[in-house]
């Protein structure tokens, strides 16, 4: 009888999901620290199980606890295990935990390189998109160097969803690994005239952010931006472009004269 009771308690522990954790914390306001400490011990037991569903459930709970300020860096290897799952539902939980708890100096981050590369090259666009979104939160110099070519390849994807994410991700790559900018520049310029407005906006955003540091390097793109300014109806993008021209006029005063009439037309259009 005692053995059956212990077994029942053990099985019930694995039945606790994120909803149960949140409910339990709310019901134990007077003893919150003690309750969470108990939950942490249960989660550690769950992470030692072979069942990936149990591990994913444990990582989901850890992610919530991390949002409350608890350190979960000790579970980095378990998070990587869930990230590598073949099931998208579990993989998404792993990447969410990684995006919240990993950082560029995280130990064992080097173990994720091949796994992320595999996800970036997945047939399922949402798996590749998930990898791009997660990577943007914890990319390191080594990851940027090793995965730059894979991300550049996605800039030419047939799927606008991936092209847009890849363009935005390249900005993070440039910050960590500036050497990637030169080989990626032709593709980035090409995306400024992408047929998809989302991809085009992403490219404008990336170039404008890069130009804030050194506008002179992007003077060659002035004709492309002038064309966008006179044809686009995206107000957000127009504001970005006008600010960019403002930076460029420091190095090429003629730009101010050339865009004056277009600026007047824009003001009249929205007046």
Please provide the spans of the model-predicted regions.
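Extended alpha-solenoid helical-repeat scaffolds
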Residues: 2-83, 87-271
């Amino acid at each position: 009888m005692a053995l059956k009771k212990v077994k029942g308690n053990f099985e019930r522990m694995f039945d606790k999901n994120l909803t149960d954790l949140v409910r339990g914390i709310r019901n134990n306001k007077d003893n919150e620290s003690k309750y969470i400490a108990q939950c942490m011990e249960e989660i550690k037991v769950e992470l030692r199980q072979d069942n990936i569903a149990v591990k994913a459930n444990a990582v989901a709970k850890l992610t919530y606890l991390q949002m409350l300020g608890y350190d979960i860096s000790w579970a980095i290897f378990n998070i990587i295990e869930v990230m590598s799952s073949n099931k998208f539902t579990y993989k998404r939980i792993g990447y969410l935990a990684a995006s919240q708890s990993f950082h560029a100096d995280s130990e064992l981050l080097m173990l994720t390189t091949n796994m992320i590369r595999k996800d970036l090259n997945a047939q399922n666009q949402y798996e590749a998109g998930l990898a791009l979104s997660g990577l943007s939160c914890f990319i390191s110099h080594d990851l940027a160097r090793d995965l730059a070519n894979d991300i550049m390849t996605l800039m030419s994807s047939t799927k606008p969803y991936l092209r847009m994410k890849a363009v935005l991700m390249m900005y993070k790559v440039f910050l960590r690994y500036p050497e990637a900018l030169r080989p990626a520049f032709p593709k980035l310029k090409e995306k400024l005239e992408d047929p998809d407005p989302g991809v085009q906006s992403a490219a404008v955003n990336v170039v404008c952010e890069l130009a804030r540091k050194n506008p002179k390097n992007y003077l060659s793109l002035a004709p492309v931006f002038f064309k966008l300014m006179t044809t686009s109806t995206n107000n957000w993008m127009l504001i970005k472009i006008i600010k960019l021209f403002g930076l460029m006029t420091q190095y090429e005063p003629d730009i101010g004269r050339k865009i004056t009439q277009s600026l007047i037309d824009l003001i009249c259009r929205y007046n």
